[in-house]
Amino acid sequence: MSENNNDKITVKRTLTLKRSVLETSTVKQNFSHGRTKAVVVETKRRKITRTDEKAETPQPITKPHVAPQRSRPRFEDAKPNEPTAKSNLSSAEIEARLRALEEAHIQERIIREQAEEEARRAKEREESLRQTIQKTEIDETPQEEEEPTLQTQTPSLSPAQSQIEPINIPITPKNTTVIEKRKADETKEDDRNSRRTNLAKSEVRAPKVLKGADEKRRGKITLNSALDEEGSARGRSMAAMRRRQEKFKRAQNQEPKEKISREVILPETITIQELAQRMTERSVDVIKFLMKQGQMMKPGDVIDADVAELIAVEFGHTVKRVLESDVEEGIFNIADNPQKMQLRPPVVTIMGHVDHGKTSLLDAIRKANVVSGEAGGITQHIGAYQVEKNGQKITFIDTPGHAAFTAMRARGARVTDIAVLVVAADDSVMPQTIESINHAKAAGVPIIVAINKIDKPTANAQKVRTELLHHEVFVETMGGETLEVEVSAKTGQNLDKLLEAILLQAEILDLKADPQRTAEGVVIEAKLDRGRGSVATVLVQKGTLHPSDIIVAGNEWGRVRALIDDHGRHVKEAVPSTPIEILGMQGTPQAGDRFAVVTHEAKAREIAEYRQRLARDKAVARQTGSRGSLEQMMSKLQTTGVKEFPLIIKGDVQGSIEAIASALEKLGNEEVRARIVHSAAGGITESDISLAEASHSAVIGFNVRANKQARDCAKTQGIEIRYYNIIYDLVDDIKAAMSGLRSPEQRETFLGNAEILEVFNITKIGKVAGCLVTEGKIERGAGVRLIRDNIVIHEGKLKTLKRFKDEVNEVQSGQECGIAFENYEDIRTGDIIETFHIEHINRTL
């Protein structure tokens, strides 16, 4: 213990004055994002007396009396603690620490005053800046900072304020002593005095550097740099104030824009969205206007030009209506050159009733056998052929006689020059004969009557002539002008006379055409052939058609790759009145479409796209127009219970598909109708099966077959594919299938009456009526009605029918029996029981 005590009070440890002068402290540095670092600071000071320090202490400029008052009590308060501190500090060390503490308080007061002065000046600068911007509105560029320590986020100073020289000020009063200690490399008193003097002088002329200067130099903004000591936010930048002023100025000077009236170009059909864009209006505004008019539409709905014009006028615009068909100008109805007109062969259409021998007559003329190639021996296509008689050519067009091919006959009559009406001598005038007469009269073409089958014993040509008079067809033998020829396709009798009559009629008509102009004609038939693509049978009416010509037919266009005549030979040109097959169409045109040759492929594509768009828009417009209101839709669903029979039809040619669709439309009634989901020329593909599966449709193939992928897909999905080659069979099968969708007819048959004589109440059975059969008979399982005072009060079925104690199947008139009803016991004496039987009968179309 004595040794330890002696160690503590040894002379060596008490006389270490050098270590007491070297002061050690720890400073905690704060960085952005919450990072800190502890730094050890050692300060070496020289021992100086208190009197010298007092003499050298500078007096503050603003309030010189404050320093001695604040430093003295602190010094006196620290003195009593010296004896009781039990520390080894000398008086010089204590005085040095007190001096440092006093200096810190002086610097804190100076910095606080400088901060207040700087806040006042910043407020004045901001106020003057706002007034300057409002008055002059001149762009000012912020002045460059002279030193990095003076970087601030406040606007640039005025010229008077910018003359103040900046000075380095510690960032916070808390770290002032630490920063000065860090900068003090020497412990001389004159350095400390000069630094204190500079701080005192800076009170008057030094503006305070904002707290975020160092952080701004680093390129990062922290929470400490964003707020100053009093918690006030940073000032707005000059660019922000300028933007705010410009925005305010625009708002003050903004005037309501006048509505601009535009000239809106309206085609035949247009969508609501496109109409709004052409008017520079919003689609929502147009739809609101239509809603006020009672029409519910969407931006993608198509409207016609009349509705679009009303909308445009309502919105204050002018309208200029144009026709998109302008692209078709100049391709049809081109005037022929009279000097280049030449005689052309006549186009003759063979018309008449089915099985009257039209195709057989044409075969006899051509010396061919077309009938054997047609399924069922009936013509289901339009055939175009050319024969030669006495060096003159005649073009024949054979039309079907079946009732389903009305459209084909109408097309044949429109493109013809002469109509040959074939009437069977043993069958006389029939419905399709009358229809053919009407088609020929509507087309305005002359008629030549060919009375066929005169070789039959039952032939009666005079009866044919007489019946034709009822339809205003006056033959020459009856005093008229219509030529008539009695022929026999089987024996070839009088075929030459028929051809001579045709040539005579053509000579009377004086048929001419210009072969040197561009070709123009009509599509007779079209189909999709495997290996050859789309094949169109056309009749050239004007001009000459060559390979590599660009043609437009209906909604399709193409470049002619090959021309094939009726004998299957490739030809180099097709002159007027020539039937020809064209290869190279981009798609399959519709039968009856007109075709023409155009000069450029771009024009052909433009015309085809216009026609496709027109057809598509019209279809959409029809659907939109039939939409109706919600009340109409609901009432229609409640009142109409029409069942639909969906079908997908694929045929070999467009004409056959058209005939099938026309025949199926006639089968419908108020209960069931056929709906053709899709129809096209060509074979049955896998996409057709997928469509049938989605729409629950049956697939019909007319003279076509399904490929292997389609057959496998149909087998997997359970889709039925039916093949037909005769239109009779197809229509009959569809008719029978549609008849099955109709609800059966209920037919009631009266059986008999029985009078209730007594009512018995039997256990486990209930009430049983003892009856006497007065009329007819009573059968078990028949329907019964309970009649009381000539009013039917119950209708149901018999539960029990007994005679004496035995169950019987029927009871004849005049016999007594016991009758019990199912789920009904309100029977009385004197009631009449009527029995009947209901028969369900399937109805047909």
UniProtKB/Swiss-Prot annotation:
Binding, GTP: 352-359, 398-402, 452-455
Cytoplasm in keyword set: yes
Residue span of region G4: 452-455
InterPro entries assigned to the protein according to its UniProt record, in alphabetical order: EF-G-like_DII, EFTu-like_2, IF2_assoc_dom_bac, IF2_II, IF2_N, P-loop_NTPase, Small_GTP-bd, T_Tr_GTP-bd_dom
Location of this chain's protein in the cell: Cytoplasm
Bias-annotated ranges (Polar residues): 156-165
Region spans: G1: 352-359
Location of region: G2: 377-381
A Pfam family this chain is assigned to: IF2_N
Record field: compositional bias (Basic and acidic residues): 119-129, 179-194, 202-217
Predominant cellular place of this UniProt entry's protein: cytoplasm
Residues annotated as domain tr-type G: 343-510
Region Disordered, annotated ranges: 44-91, 119-256
Biased amino acid composition, Acidic residues: 139-148
Segments forming a coiled coil: none
Signal peptide: none
Region of interest (G3), residue spans: 398-401
Keywords (A to Z) from UniProt: Cytoplasm, GTP-binding, Initiation factor, Nucleotide-binding, Protein biosynthesis
Xref: NCBIfam families: IF-2, small_GTP
PANTHER family assigned: TR-TYPE G DOMAIN-CONTAINING PROTEIN (PTHR43381:SF5), TRANSLATION INITIATION FACTOR IF-2-RELATED (PTHR43381)
Family affiliation: Belongs to the TRAFAC class translation factor GTPase superfamily. Classic translation factor GTPase family. IF-2 subfamily.
The name this protein goes by in its record: Translation initiation factor IF-2
Source species: Bartonella henselae (strain ATCC 49882 / DSM 28221 / CCUG 30454 / Houston 1)
Gene: infB
